[in-house]
Amino acid sequence: MFFYPLDHVAVAVTSLEEARSVFQLLTGDTCSTPEVLESQGVRVQFIGSLELLEPLGPESTVGRFLARRGPGLHHIAYRVPNLPQALARLKAEGVRLIDDVPRPGARGHMVAFVHPRSSEGILVELVESEAPVTS
C-alpha cells in the first residue's frame, strides 16, 4: 500500500492581499512571492503549507468556484515522487481523475487532480516532488 504525505491545503480567496494578512498573522509563516499561472487562470501565494488561490477572472476555475461557494477550502494536495506512476495506479484502482496527464503547477512542479467524486467530495491535487516542499 502507498501513502503520500500532505503537501499543502489550498484556499480560494477573492484577494491575495487581504487573505495573506490574516493567514500570516495566524501562522507566523513567511509568504512566497505571488505566482501567476495563466494556464489555470489563477494567482497563487504560499504561506508555509497553505496555498492561497485568487482567480484572474470570473470564468477561471477558481472564479467559478468562488461564485458558487464563496471563499474557503478549495483542495488538499499530496506529494508523490512519480506522478505518472501514481496516476496509473489510481486509474487502475478505478479512481476518477480530472487529469490523466500531469500538467505544470505552482512552484515549478507537475501536478494532476483527482475528481471530488472519487474522494468524498474533496478536490485532491497530486504534486510531483521528492523532497519536502517549502515556500
Q: For each predicted feature, which ranges?
A:
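Alpha-helix N-cap/helix-start and coil->helix boundary motif
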Residues: 16-17, 59, 83, 120
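A cross-kingdom feature marking solvent-exposed beta-strand/loop segments within repeated
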Residues: 1, 7, 19, 24, ...
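Vicinal oxygen chelate
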Residues: 1-2, 6-14, 43-48, 54, 63-89, ...
